Amino acid sequence: MRSRLVVLAVVLVAAAALVTVGVAATMHETALPKLKGTIGPGYTISLKNAQGKRVTTLKHGKYTLVVQDKANIHNFTLNGPGIKNKMITGTSFVGPKTVTVTLKAGKYRYYCTVHPFVSKTFRVT
């Protein structure tokens, strides 16, 4: 009986440790600021912050970028310091895609490579 109690105690301690590590990892992942990109419908593209406002300036650092591609005729591509024409969604893709990006100081452009006039810019300080 005593050995079963010891095994149970070890299992409970191990489970608590796993839960703690899982919570810490989840907290780290959710700590990144979020950006929301949208391409389509039609010839529209946008990038908004967590408050829903158009991004014109950001602080350098890591961000979670969630792109909602609403048209299979476009792609969402990001270009700037340290990010060379990173295609986040392709023309055959419709739906959400989440990536982590590290933004350095400078000027960035987000655009559709198929329709380059579907384009906007922002600065990172």
Can you describe what each PLM-predicted range is?
Residues 25-50, 73-74, 90-125:
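Extracellular/periplasmic metallocenter environments
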Residues 61-65:
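Structural beta-strand segments of beta-rich domains
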Residues 51-57:
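Short beta-strand segments of immunoglobulin-like
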Residues 9-17:
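Bacterial N-terminal signal peptides
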Residues 66, 75-79:
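Beta-strand signatures of extracellular beta-sandwich domains
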Residues 16-24:
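C-terminal segment of classical bacterial N-terminal signal peptides
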Residues 1-9:
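Bacterial N-terminal signal peptides that target proteins for export
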